[in-house]
Amino acid sequence: MNLRLTGAKALPEDDLTMRIAVAAAVEIGLLAVVAQDVLSDRTAILALVLAPVGYVVSYRRRAATNVAVKVALACGLFVATARFLGQIGYVTSPDAARAPLAALFLWVQVLHAFDVPRRRDLAFSMVSSTTMIAVGGALALTTSYLWWLLAWAVASAWWLWASSRRTC
């Protein structure tokens, strides 16, 4: 009996409209967290610049195997987790843990942007952008946060429309 354990690999997603909608939703989620002023300026600027760069790189390399990119991203995730664990060691209350956790979520989202070749990966990015919006909402102190939520809802509706035009 000769069983093969690997399944068929999904095709890369070529729909640029869907990719732009996902990138917009992610960027809005990142902006919503950055606007709460719990991150360093350097972290905020890097995240806001690197996420769109990541989506462009991912689009251009969507048909490649990207092993080196995946190894680099795994290393980046280890660094982000190590920074989070280092920062969380000095936390004196559960409320004070929100900022380091927000930074960790932010870096996971940014790093993930560099490897989203398939529709399924784009859907994971949308779920992650939902998490970013929730984190921003948990950190928000005023009702003006609703504007971020509204902008994200528009981008999410755009993604739903784009993903419903063609099914896999």
Predicted regions, residues:
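Linear, non-domain "peripheral" regions
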Residues: 1-168
